[in-house]
């Protein structure tokens, strides 16, 4: 322990803002006679005196990096959505806070009464992503003189939501966009949707297969769907040959090759020679020979490979595509009827806006560089081998759907750092009860403060706290005295300009349900307040969810941060303005998160809102609103029977009321009230209700769905809506 101030001249005046009690013989201290000492952190001091604008928030949260071209901050300090990307006109931008208010306001105020958490989908962004992907490949094909075309395939595992898949088929029908399935239910889904799509769109059948899966894929072929059965295992070939002959269907076969090329990040584990999927070169040769012996070598038409999701650089991409193109050319040489090369997934998303090649959260390229690299690598190998250029496919699901949905949730409360205030008498009494070592720490803390040795103050404060904790464990200090120690240590940290403690913001969310990849693989997503961005965030915090699990928190953020800049909550939670609410948004989570979410603590999925750009006063129309699963829904998912549970509880309530000493009329009212309360609990979502006036069961009168045909969006809200109180346009069936 540093020998500081064991004997200090009492005449030495303390620094501004300090006065510590030495012992009971000294006069009572003054608390903050002249304010706290100036912070030694000049950067913080400078920042706190500057004007804050939406541009500052945009830079602070890197919104222009990860959000471009779909998300920005408007002049009101709200997140603004550009549904058509760079082609969005100023009057077409959608204020996300207004969408949230439309969703959550009570129905009698023109809202939909939906409960949080809430996923907001923007099909216009989905359309723009598809068109952008097709456009960059079309440009690469044309500019490089490539003699075939590109046609994409959407892997439905990324997001199997009905409207998402149907939108992709509809938006992509003009350029032969197809679907990929990896299981029997996904195959059924894809078959049904592609009946309304392009007849040239591919139906790629991946995943492990049994006889039923293969039979179903061949049925799809009979239904004139452009179906390709991709061999993941060598053993699947025998089933394909046998069943296709029995069904008298000539199959189109693909095979997945295990490449030597792989990347070292988390998502590269499915690639390389030891990857989970695909055939080795030895197995490929055997497959070719068996097909030739069966007179079906012409059926082999597609080569599939997958370097891994989130390919970090175009150099690695070119290496992998070049290797696959060599295999493709060898299959042509061996007599296969090759037509397609399927690059699989890998087109990455820049989650943190850094355009870095060294992180799973970013990639060092854009759409155009990706497309140009793929086309160039295939063309180079095929030209050298004098092989006809194949149709290029990719399964870029993450790149297609990540941007189109935003998860919105509320911060309902936060931990406070308010210290216990002690009078001079209480402080003297506290010091007298300390043991000798703790009292020495307190005196040394006082001396260090008087000398202005602020770093040493922190050291002695920590030692004092630890010794007092030990005294408390031994029963020598009571809980009020331990709280006083915490108060003194907090006082020291604040007074000397030490960094403010990180607060915990409690959010109305389940990490396990809505952000499972953060819990499972530390995947980071940009999280930002969707409003108040014209105000300076004054605290830093981590996010803690509703589950009874220590893993139910988000304490890592993009940019390598362990906390997030946040705004102060009001005394009752929320953000003070905007009706006292404080809303946060998680962006770029449109791929995988909904499909992977579980039911930990029986918290179900979020409410869902589908929003399209329109010519209405607020620039949007709600085309579909679905309340999240109720308590009854999640109980039913775990094999409980909510109806029987309700009857059991209602019977118990009836017994309770019957045995109560009330008038018969009052008993009837009491029973009705209890039964109604129980029914409401089953019908409500499992999450917190932060506004008792809102309608929690938005589906009560309409079976759970608000919807309209997309054609009806055109012209919706054409009526005058100048007044802010006027109902925002939406369609309700």
UniProtKB/Swiss-Prot annotation:
Entry EC no(s): 4.1.1.19
InterPro entries: Ala_racemase/Decarboxylase_C, Arg_decrbxlase, De-COase2_CS, De-COase2_N, De-COase2_pyr-phos_BS, Orn/DAP/Arg_de-COase, PLP-binding_barrel
Keywords assigned by UniProt, alphabetized: Alkaloid metabolism, Chloroplast, Decarboxylase, Lyase, Magnesium, Plastid, Pyridoxal phosphate, Spermidine biosynthesis, Transit peptide
Gene disruption phenotype: Reduced alkaloids and nicotin levels associated with a lower putrescine production. Occasionally, an early senescence and a lower viability of the older leaves is observed.
GO cellular component: chloroplast
Binding site for pyridoxal 5'-phosphate: 309, 346, 395-398, 592
PROSITE patterns: ODR_DC_2_1, ODR_DC_2_2
Pfam families from the UniProt entry: Orn_Arg_deC_N
Domain of life: Eukaryota
Localization terms from the record: Plastid, Chloroplast
UniProt subunit comment: Interacts, via its C-terminal internal region, with the tobacco mosaic virus (TMV) replicase helicase region.
Name of the featured protein: Arginine decarboxylase 1A, chloroplastic
Gene name for this UniProt entry: ADC1A
């Amino acid at each position: 322990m540093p020998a500081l101030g064991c004997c200090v001249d009492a005449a030495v005046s303390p620094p501004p803002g300090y006065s510590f009690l030495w012992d009971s013989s000294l006069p009572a201290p003054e608390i903050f006679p002249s304010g706290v000492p100036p912070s030694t952190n000049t950067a913080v001091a400078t920042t706190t005196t500057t004007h804050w604008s939406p541009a500052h928030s945009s830079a602070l949260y890197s919104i222009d990096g990860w959000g471009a071209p779909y998300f920005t901050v408007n002049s009101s300090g709200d997140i603004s959505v550009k549904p058509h990307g760079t082609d969005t006109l100023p009057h077409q931008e959608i204020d996300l806070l207004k969408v949230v208010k439309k969703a959550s306001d009570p129905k009698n105020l023109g809202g939909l009464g939906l409960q949080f958490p809430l996923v907001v989908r923007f099909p216009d962004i989905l359309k723009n992503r598809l068109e952008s992907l097709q456009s960059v490949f079309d440009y690469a094909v044309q500019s490089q003189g490539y003699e075939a075309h590109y046609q994409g395939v959407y892997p439905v595992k990324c997001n199997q939501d009905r409207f998402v898949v149907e939108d992709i088929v509809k938006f992509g029908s003009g350029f032969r966009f197809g679907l990929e399935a990896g299981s029997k239910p996904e195959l059924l889904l894809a078959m049904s949707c592609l009946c309304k799509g392009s007849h040239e769109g591919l139906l790629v059948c991946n995943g492990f297969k049994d006889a039923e899966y293969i039979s179903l894929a061949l049925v799809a072929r009979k239904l004139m769907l452009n179906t390709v059965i991709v061999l993941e295992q060598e053993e699947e070939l025998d089933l394909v040959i046998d069943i296709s002959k029995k069904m008298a269907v000539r199959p189109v076969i693909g095979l997945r090759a295990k490449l030597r090329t792989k990347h070292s990040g988390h998502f590269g584990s499915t690639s390389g020679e030891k990857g989970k999927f695909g055939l080795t070169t030895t197995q490929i040769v055997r497959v070719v020979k068996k097909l030739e012996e069966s007179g079906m070598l012409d059926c082999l038409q597609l080569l599939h490979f997958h370097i891994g999701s989130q390919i970090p650089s175009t150099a690695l991409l070119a290496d992998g595509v070049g290797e696959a193109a060599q295999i493709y050319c060898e299959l042509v040489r061996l007599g296969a009827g090759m037509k397609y090369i399927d690059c699989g997934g890998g087109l990455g998303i820049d989650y943190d806006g850094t355009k870095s090649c060294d992180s799973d959260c970013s990639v060092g390229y854009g759409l155009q560089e990706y497309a140009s690299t793929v086309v160039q690598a295939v063309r180079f190998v095929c030209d050298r081998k004098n092989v006809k250029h194949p149709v290029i496919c990719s399964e870029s699901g993450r790149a297609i759907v990540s941007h189109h949905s935003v998860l919105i949730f509320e911060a309902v409360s936060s931990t406070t750092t308010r210290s216990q205030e002690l009078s001079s008498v209480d402080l003297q009494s506290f010091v007298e009860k300390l043991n000798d070592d703790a009292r020495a720490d307190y005196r040394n803390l006082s001396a260090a403060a008087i000398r202005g040795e602020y770093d040493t103050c922190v050291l002695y404060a920590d030692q004092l706290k630890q010794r007092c904790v030990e005294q408390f464990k031994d029963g020598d200090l009571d809980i009020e005295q331990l709280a006083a120690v915490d108060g003194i240590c907090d006082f020291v940290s604040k007074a000397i300009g030490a960094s403010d403690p990180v607060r915990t913001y409690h959010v109305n969310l389940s990490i396990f349900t809505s952000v499972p990849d953060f819990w499972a693989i530390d995947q980071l997503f940009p999280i930002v307040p969707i409003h108040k961005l014209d105000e300076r965030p004054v605290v830093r915090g981590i996010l803690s969810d509703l589950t009874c699990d220590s893993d139910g928190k988000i304490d890592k953020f993009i940019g390598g941060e362990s906390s997030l800049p946040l705004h102060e909550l009001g005394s009752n939670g929320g953000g003070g303005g905007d009706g006292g609410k404080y809303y946060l948004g998680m962006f770029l989570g449109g791929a995988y998160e909904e499909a992977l979410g579980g039911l930990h603590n029986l918290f179900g999925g979020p409410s869902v809102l589908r929003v399209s750009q329109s010519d209405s006063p607020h620039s949007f129309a709600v085309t579909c609103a679905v309340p999240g699963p109720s308590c009854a829904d999640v109980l039913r998912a775990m094999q409980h029977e909510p109806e029987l549970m309700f009857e059991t509880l209602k019977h118990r309530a009836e017994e309770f009321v019957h045995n109560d000493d009330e008038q018969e009329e009052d008993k009837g009212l009491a029973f009705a009230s209890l039964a109604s309360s129980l029914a409401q609990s089953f019908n409500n979502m499992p999450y917190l209700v932060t506004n008792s006036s809102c309608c929690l069961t938005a589906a009560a009168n309409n079976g759970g769905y608000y919807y309209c045909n997309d054609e009806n969006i055109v012209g919706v809200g054409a009526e005058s809506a100048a007044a802010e109180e006027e109902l925002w346009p939406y369609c309700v069936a």
